[in-house]
Design a protein with these regions (language model features):
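Sequence/structural signature of beta-propeller domains
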Residues: 1-243
Length: 243
């Protein structure tokens, strides 16, 4: 059973009880079947939700469905009411040299590009793709714009956006490619990758001093919270200045 833990100012860890907590619930109508498997025998159902975020009165949910376009983005009004089947999404994966509809978004962040709300979404083997939020209509199918290929044999874990020195940056931690920092200054100029390629598109730098980062989130305008795993497997929760 999943639990939520809290840490107080003294560093004491305790369980956050959900007893008698008011809540609402949304049930996905077209999640993969309990016994559905991927090509490697892994459960597809556990990928029904791979990431989520609250934006302007809606909960945005990425994951898989049981539809032909299995990769799905959902925009669910909050407080929850009826949940539709979501939007099937397709991308061109430059590292694989093909169009894909079955790979789920691993992590995403809402971001405005030239005053238009978008999702910036990262996938396994690390294509970075943008989707206009206005395209996420129930039952429709949309093609994302791949604006970067950031390296294969890797899974993006978390992604945040922050401002520093008058410029917005994306910070993303990964399973095997460290923590990447990308400027969004010219993000609107990338029209999309359409052929097989290696690392290309929106450039990044690797933050060398940040190693073993398993989870990443913004703490405030100047700091981030990271969960770091060392070589022994021990986990440390740390606060860092945004780079």
């Amino acid at each position: 059973m999943a639990v939520i833990l809290k840490v107080d100012a003294a560093g004491k860890i305790s369980e956050f009880s959900l007893d008698n907590i008011k809540h609402s619930k949304a049930t996905l109508p077209n999640a993969p079947a309990p016994d559905a498997k991927d090509g490697r025998g892994g459960s597809l159902r556990v990928q029904s939700i791979t990431d989520l975020a609250y934006v302007d009165g809606k909960v945005l949910v990425a994951g898989l469905s049981n539809e032909e376009f299995a990769s799905t983005l959902r925009s669910i009004p909050f407080p929850f009411s009826a949940v539709d089947g979501g939007t099937g999404v397709e991308i061109f994966h430059g590292a694989h040299g093909r169009f894909e509809t079955n790979a789920p978004v691993r992590t995403f962040v809402p971001y405005e590009i030239q005053n238009e709300p978008h999702l910036l979404a990262a996938y396994t083997c690390t294509p970075l793709v943008k989707f206009p939020l206005s395209d996420l209509k129930p039952g429709s199918k949309v093609m994302g714009t791949t604006i970067a290929e950031l390296g294969n044999r890797n899974r993006p874990l978390d992604m945040i956006v922050y401002a520093k020195g008058g410029t917005d940056y994306i910070l993303m931690n990964n399973s095997s490619r460290g923590v990447m920092k990308m400027s969004t200054k010219d993000i609107h100029k990338y029209e999309g990758i359409k052929e097989k390629t290696d690392i290309t598109g929106l450039p990044y730098e690797t933050i060398a001093e940040l190693k073993g980062v398993q989870q990443l989130d913004r703490l405030d305008d100047n700091n981030a919270l990271i969960l770091v795993q060392d070589e022994s497997g021990a986990m440390d929760l740390k606060t860092i200045a945004l780079p």
